[in-house]
């Protein structure tokens, strides 16, 4: 179909959907196309898009410092707003915001519980304004400048509950200077002005708001850290890391509350990270390569702090994540609590997402691949659990598909951790497959409830997500194997995964679609231009089509990470024009669906417009959706529901699955 459909989507408007439904819909006998028994298809109901991608009943829960209240997001007149509720029997929630256009951002409490802090931007432009909310009166006050300024919360401390350290790029859009903000008056004072690219992170302030660490990125992408303890007047070199070690997570963290130990992560002597700590007395005199103590060596995947003592700030629980996650206890005082929560979780996993100032009340989320997440309260002193909410309870009435963890191999032997969700409609035999590519590309896919996997499984498609080389979370070698491999070995990994699915009888070789957002969208475009015979169609959401223009238009505040980004892409070593799908449009033979937010500052709308125009001029089939009130991704559930409605019809047309009607 040689036609472009440019759709500007107004919130609440469905006329364009009905019109598009007439264009996209064809009579489809999906039962015969998928080899299903009619009774089987009838028994498994269609999960509505509204259930999968609409507003959750509740999400973004935060526990007050005294453990007696929660804030959360819940719908009001169809839009997520912020609410607060006391944790006592019979207490009713009270709404604090009145957003009518775009979902409210989550909030969290100041250390004294006096205020809630939240944020907003303008339709996805990422110019974030910080907002102070009174949880009693609902009075709101903007704390930071608006237009053209990206504000971020850097630090809060219980010993200075009336203050907040924020980062603002109002002086120079490339860099975030640090300011101490008075929460009552809104007045601010300069704490640290970035000079020569020296950046300061959240963990690198002491309890008197003094900067003790700074970092700078070298010309080759390496990272250097300088240290200045409060008792010293001069900065001196502390740590230096190569580009490879810095990219894979090596760096200092923060002091625990007594100031005796500074914690950090190193990946300098192996493939997997290790947690270390430096003694303050040693730091007073050493320079570079200071001796440290080993806290824990990761055995697989990534390593994060899962729980810290709120009084001492010492890490209590570590979480290692490979294909699945596991917890490691550093502080045995919490062992009985974790054992009780594991018993309560059953086959599910759980995360401790918040706690009160005394560490007695925990906010816990239980989650799995086939059940709506649940928020619970765990009282340590009483060893009792209280269920608060299910995020999307209506989802639990439908048959959901399990997510399988896989160990695939690339053609050069590299391990490819992957996840497969099989169609809930399929009998034995090859089925249509959607290869869903994650963005980043320095990111990863995880095991768990994935609404898009569930949508596709419910409509009759297998879905495969692959952690290709360059993904994070699977060791330094796996990450660095992606260096300079856009349009090359990173794409080979995706092709190898599809080949495996075909050779094992999982995928129908004539019905494979590649789909993704951001870098995943780029990979979808690369799939159509580099391997035009392999994929029946492609779906690109906010993906770049031209690597040269992508790098030329990155936001100013990305300048500090420009060099590492360019090194991973391979600037100076690879032909950027050659790895840009736009320059291979003449190779496209299959249909393409593109969606983009008009306010995207990371991947400009022009990245999609140019390839659409190039395809249109050649009479190639492309469907193009523009969302005027979105940025880099679809935040508004109404837009997400609309997009996935178009996606369903697109896939049904080219793969033969079923689809919930549009409109």
Language-model-derived ranges and their functions:
Residues 54-59, 77-82, 99-105, 110-417, ...:
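Peripheral, non-catalytic segments that deliver or gate enzyme domains
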Residues 73-96:
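Beta-propeller domains
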Residues 39-41:
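Boundary at the C-terminal end of the N-terminal hydrophobic targeting segment
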Residues 394-510, 517-518, 523, 551-560:
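Cap/lid segment of the alpha/beta-hydrolase catalytic domain
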Residues 20-33:
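Bacterial N-terminal signal peptides
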Residues 468-663:
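Active-site-proximal cap/loop segments of hydrolase catalytic domains
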Residues 1-17:
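N-terminal secretory signal peptides that target proteins for export/translocation
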Residues 43-76:
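Mature N-terminal segment immediately following signal peptide/propeptide cleavage
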């Amino acid at each position: 179909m040689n036609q472009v459909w440019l759709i500007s989507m107004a919130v609440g408007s469905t006329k364009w959907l009905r019109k598009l439904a007439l264009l996209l819909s064809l009579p489809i006998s999906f039962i015969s196309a998928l080899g299903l028994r009619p009774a089987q298809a009838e028994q498994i109901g269609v999960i509505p898009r509204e259930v999968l991608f609409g507003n959750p009943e509740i999400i973004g829960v935060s526990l007050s410092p005294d453990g007696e209240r929660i804030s959360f997001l819940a719908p009001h007149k169809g839009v997520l707003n912020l609410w607060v509720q006391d944790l006592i029997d019979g207490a009713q929630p009270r709404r604090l915001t009145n957003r009518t256009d775009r979902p409210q951002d989550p909030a969290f409490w100041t250390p004294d519980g006096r205020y809630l802090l939240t944020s907003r931007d303008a339709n996805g432009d990422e110019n974030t304004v910080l907002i102070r909310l009174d949880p009693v009166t609902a009075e709101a006050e903007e704390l930071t400048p608006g237009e053209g300024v990206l504000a971020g919360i850097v630090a809060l401390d219980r010993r200075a509950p009336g203050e907040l350290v924020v980062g603002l790029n109002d002086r120079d859009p490339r860099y975030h200077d640090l300011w101490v903000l008075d929460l009552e008056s809104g007045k601010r004072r300069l704490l640290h002005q970035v000079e020569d690219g020296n950046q300061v992170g959240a963990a690198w302030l002491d309890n008197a708001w003094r900067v003790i660490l700074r970092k700078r990125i070298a010309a080759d992408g390496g990272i250097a850290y300088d240290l200045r303890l409060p008792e010293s007047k001069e900065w001196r070199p502390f740590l230096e890391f190569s580009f490879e070690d810095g990219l894979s997570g090596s760096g200092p963290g923060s002091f625990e509350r007594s100031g005796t130990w500074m914690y950090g992560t190193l990946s300098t002597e192996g493939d997997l990270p290790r947690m270390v700590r430096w003694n303050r007395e040693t730091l007073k005199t050493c320079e570079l390569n200071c001796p440290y103590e080993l806290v824990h060596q990761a055995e697989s995947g990534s390593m994060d702090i899962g729980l810290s003592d709120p009084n001492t700030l010492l890490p209590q629980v570590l979480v290692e994540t490979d294909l699945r996650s596991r917890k490691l206890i550093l502080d045995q005082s919490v062992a009985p609590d974790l054992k009780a929560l594991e018993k309560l979780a059953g086959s599910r996993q759980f995360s401790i997402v918040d706690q009160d100032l005394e560490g007695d009340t925990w906010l816990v989320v239980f989650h799995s691949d086939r059940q709506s997440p649940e928020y619970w309260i765990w009282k340590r002193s009483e060893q009792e659990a209280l269920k608060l909410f299910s995020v999307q309870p209506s989802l639990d009435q439908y048959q959901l598909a399990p997510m399988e963890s896989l160990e695939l191999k690339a053609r050069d032997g590299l391990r490819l951790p992957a996840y497969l969700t099989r169609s809930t409609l399929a009998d034995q035999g090859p089925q249509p497959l959607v290869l869903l590519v994650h963005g980043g590309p320095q990111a990863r896919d995880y095991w768990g409830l994935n609404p898009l996997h569930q949508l596709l499984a419910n409509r009759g498609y297998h879905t495969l997500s692959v952690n290709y080389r360059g993904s994070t979370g699977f060791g330094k070698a796996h990450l660095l194997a992606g260096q300079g491999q856009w349009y090359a070995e990173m794409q080979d990994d995706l092709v190898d995964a599809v080949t495996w699915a075909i050779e094992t009888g999982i995928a129908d070789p004539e019905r494979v679609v590649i789909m993704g957002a951001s870098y995943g969208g780029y990979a979808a475009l690369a799939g159509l231009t580099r391997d035009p015979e392999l994929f029946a169609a492609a779906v690109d959401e906010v993906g770049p089509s031209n690597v040269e223009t992508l790098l030329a238009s990155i936001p100013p505040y990305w300048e500090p990470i420009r060099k590492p980004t360019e090194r991973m892409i391979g600037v100076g070593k690879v032909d950027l024009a050659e790895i840009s799908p736009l320059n291979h449009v003449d190779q496209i033979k299959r249909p393409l669906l593109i969606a983009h937010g008009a306010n995207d500052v990371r991947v400009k709308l022009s990245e999609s417009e140019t390839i659409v125009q190039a395809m249109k001029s050649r009479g190639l089939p492309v469907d193009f959706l523009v969302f005027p009130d979105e940025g880099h991704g679809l935040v508004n559930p109404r837009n997400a529901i609309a997009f996935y409605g178009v996606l369903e019809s697109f896939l049904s047309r080219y793969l033969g699955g079923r689809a919930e009607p549009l409109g």
